[in-house]
């Protein structure tokens, strides 16, 4: 696995990707590049990483954040909730919506052809 200047979690400053490093490593090694973390990247930045050789993106923080926001909103609207089951449904939908958004961004213009 290669992580070209990436760290996990939310960032205080804008993340910077070394695109040239991704290209060089992919070209010289011939092995697939894994991006460990993609928090804060735009759709354009994700696509540029893919074009340069990233073949796997480990994605968690923003999906986890969407889950938490979904749970908080549900509990605010339903304060009488006393078990987790209904919260888990909302959490699952929030994560699914977040991942759908990511997939649409990554494959913009390529899906539904």
Give the location of each predicted region.
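Structural preference for beta-strand elements that scaffold enzyme active sites
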Residues: 1, 32-34, 56
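Glycine/Thr-rich beta-alpha phosphate-binding loop at enzyme active sites
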Residues: 1-20
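Glycine-rich phosphate-binding active-site loops on the catalytic face of alpha/beta enzymes
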Residues: 4-8, 52-70
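Alpha-helix-loop-beta-strand connector modules within alpha/beta enzyme cores
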Residues: 14-35
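Catalytic cores of alpha/beta
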Residues: 38-54
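Extended, intrinsically disordered, low-complexity segments
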Residues: 73-113
């Amino acid at each position: 696995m290669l992580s070209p200047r990436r760290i996990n979690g939310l960032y205080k400053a804008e993340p910077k990707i070394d695109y040239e490093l991704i290209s060089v490593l992919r070209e010289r090694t011939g092995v697939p590049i894994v991006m460990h973390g993609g928090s804060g990247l735009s759709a354009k930045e994700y696509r540029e990483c893919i074009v340069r050789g990233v073949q796997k993106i480990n994605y968690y923080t923003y999906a986890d954040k969407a889950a938490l926001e979904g749970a908080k909103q549900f509990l605010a609207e339903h304060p009488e909730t006393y078990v987790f089951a209904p919260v888990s449904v909302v959490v699952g939908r929030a994560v699914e919506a977040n991942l759908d958004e990511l997939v649409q961004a990554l494959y913009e213009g390529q899906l539904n052809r």
